[in-house]
Amino acid sequence: SSDLPNEIKDAGIPIFNVDTAVIEDDIENFVTQFVGTNAYMAGQLVGEQMAKDYPDGADIAILDFPSNESCVDRVNGFLDGLGDNKDKFNIVAQQDGEAALDASMSLAEDIITANTDLQAFFCINDPSALGAAAAVKAANKTGQIGVYSIDASPDGKQALLDGEFTAVACQVPVQIAEYAFNAAQKYVGGDTTIDEKKVYLDSHLVLKDEAKQTVNDWQ
């Protein structure tokens, strides 16, 4: 029922919110602690890598997912990560790939067709990037059009190893689960001090060596 959060709160039961944050009011009123990946940082790392890969700038496309706050943070981080070279990057398209492979593939095909000088895609997650990579492959442009992603899922790592992804920054769901579990255990055990209401764990770029060693796992 809609009153369930109040019932949980009244019963003195802690709520640990992981990965995707509930709305701000609910965090304030009901959540003991939120634990997620630093989405802005993940985007920033990818933007910095793209700026290194294209020092003279490039025509790029962004497949976003504006209805999800974390994905908006990733795009903002990415744009800031381009840094001083940001003005050299021409965003020829920014469209909602719905964080999904099929929708992103269809959009990417149209973007590639309409923009013969396109040099790279930034996608907000691996399913979206896998769709873009499939469109790039269908156009025989693997290696010519870069695909930059965030997640580093097993499928994303394989795509990196296969040369279909150029770079990928990681989500850290395993670390999130471990952190939240330990925090909850501590809380239930009687230590109810919460240093930070919201905890954002660091992202990093997953390079091929790490991808090879952890290809079947999340981090």
Which positions does each model-derived feature cover?
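Hydrophobic alpha-helical
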Residues: 2-11, 78, 97-158
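Flexible loop/hinge segments that line or gate small-molecule binding clefts
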Residues: 4-41, 52, 59, 153-161, ...
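Structured segments of extracytoplasmic/periplasmic soluble domains
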Residues: 7, 11-14, 18-21, 49-57, ...
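Structural recognition of the beta-strand scaffold that forms the well-ordered cores
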Residues: 14-19, 34-36, 59-64, 93, ...
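Hydrophobic alpha-helical segments within soluble ligand-binding/sensing domains
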Residues: 34-59, 103-105, 152-156, 172-189
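Short, solvent-exposed amphipathic alpha-helices that sit
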Residues: 42-46, 70-89, 103, 107, ...
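Short beta-strand elements in bilobed, periplasmic/extracellular small-molecule ligand-binding domains
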Residues: 59-64, 79-101
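Hinge/cleft segment of the Venus flytrap/periplasmic-binding protein
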Residues: 82-83, 172-219
